[in-house]
Design a protein with these regions (language model features):
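Bacterial Sec-dependent N-terminal signal peptides
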Residues: 1-21
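Active-site rim/loop-helix segments in enzyme catalytic domains that contact anionic ligands
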Residues: 20-147, 169, 173-180, 184, ...
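The feature marks non-catalytic terminal segments
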Residues: 21-22, 29, 181-298
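Catalytic metal-binding/acid-base residues of hydrolase active sites
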Residues: 51, 117, 158-160, 209
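Short loop/turn segments at secondary-structure transitions that flank enzyme active sites
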Residues: 75-78, 159, 209-212
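A structural signal for short, well-ordered beta-strand segments and their strand-loop junctions
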Residues: 113, 154-155, 202-207
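Short acidic, glycine-rich surface-loop motifs adjacent to enzyme active sites
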Residues: 148-161
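Active-site loop-helix segments enriched in His/Asp/Glu that coordinate
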Residues: 161-171
């Protein structure tokens, strides 16, 4: 009898849940989506774990620059902490996957993964590659680049080891290698039955200001974005949107409050076409490159 009532209760609850209407976009979100149709540019942000991504950069690119913006997390965070439950390992990876998907709903990005496993902390990329099948993870990154077709790739960490975690350094190393291989038909040719080769224009490192200052870099010559800008259409700054996104990483205790201020992020060119001040310099983000596209305006 108890089983009967339990099943009945489950059916009723599921019926109620699935009957809930989808959130209705407000007029500002609809207008933003229409404006976004005017642009074809895309950016792929790459790092190692859920919560590594700079949600302010993703928010700015997706809702400010109106570009198709993706985050490629090489792992699903199986080796992280869990401050809200008892799930660990694969179950924690499932939980953190959902947290990433919820974060993207708020900052406007798209989410991608590779088969890499978060097996815990490592000191170096060499140690990381002893556990990861480097060639398979690299093929996954190349696949995402060929399918997503980004104009620009941004890495969260440098490839030179200052990221504080072997996974972090490995993610940057693999991103730089994939940048070259994605346009090589000899690299992972089995993918070409489904996608075409693709050549992004540039790879940037989302550099840390203290690291640049330590090297006495001339910041005026490094492309930057003001992530604290206010979006009058949405009524929020991009850092406020970012806070809503980052707060979805509940298992990691990563809630944050939004602010409005000048918050500059700098982007160091790692590979690709040279640039002076604008990350998108020389890249046509309009429909002009598409046959008949000059007639398309929203």
């Amino acid at each position: 009898m108890k089983l009967k009532y339990s099943l009945l209760f489950t059916i009723i609850v599921c019926t109620i849940l699935f009957a809930q209407p989808k959130p209705t976009p407000n007029s500002s979100e609809i207008k933003l989506a229409l404006k976004k149709l005017d642009l074809l540019g895309s950016v792929l942000y790459i790092a190692a774990h859920p919560d590594d991504e700079n949600t302010a950069v993703i928010s700015y690119l997706a809702k400010g620059k109106l570009l198709r913006t993706g985050y490629l997390s090489l792992t699903r965070g199986d080796g992280g902490q869990n401050l809200i439950g008892t799930e660990q390992s694969e179950q924690l990876g499932v939980l953190r996957t959902q947290e990433l998907l919820e974060a993207r709903k708020r900052d406007g990005g798209e989410q991608f993964f590779t088969r890499a496993i978060d097996f815990g902390y490592t000191k170096s990329s060499e140690e990381t590659f002893e556990f990861w099948d480097k060639e398979k993870v690299l093929s996954d990154i190349v696949w995402v680049i060929r399918k997503f077709r980004p104009d620009i790739i941004i890495t969260r960490f440098p490839s030179t080891g200052e990221g504080g975690h072997g996974h972090h350094t490995a993610s940057a190393i693999l991103a730089l290698e994939a940048f070259d291989l994605a346009n090589d038909p000899k690299a992972f040719p089995e993918q070409l039955k489904y996608v075409n080769v693709w050549k992004p224009k540039r790879v940037f490192w989302n550099a840390w200001l203290p690291a640049l200052q330590k090297q006495q870099m001339d910041l005026s010559k490094i492309p930057s974005l003001n992530l604290g800008e206010f979006n009058s259409l949405l009524g929020k700054s991009y850092t406020e949107i970012s806070a809503l996104s980052r707060s979805m990483h509940k298992s990691q205790g990563f809630g944050s409050s939004g602010i409005r201020n000048t918050i500059l992020n700098y982007f160091m060119l790692q590979k690709g076409d040279s640039v002076v001040n604008d990350m998108f310099e020389g890249i046509d983000l309009s429909w002009n490159g598409v046959e008949g596209g000059d007639e398309i305006h929203t």
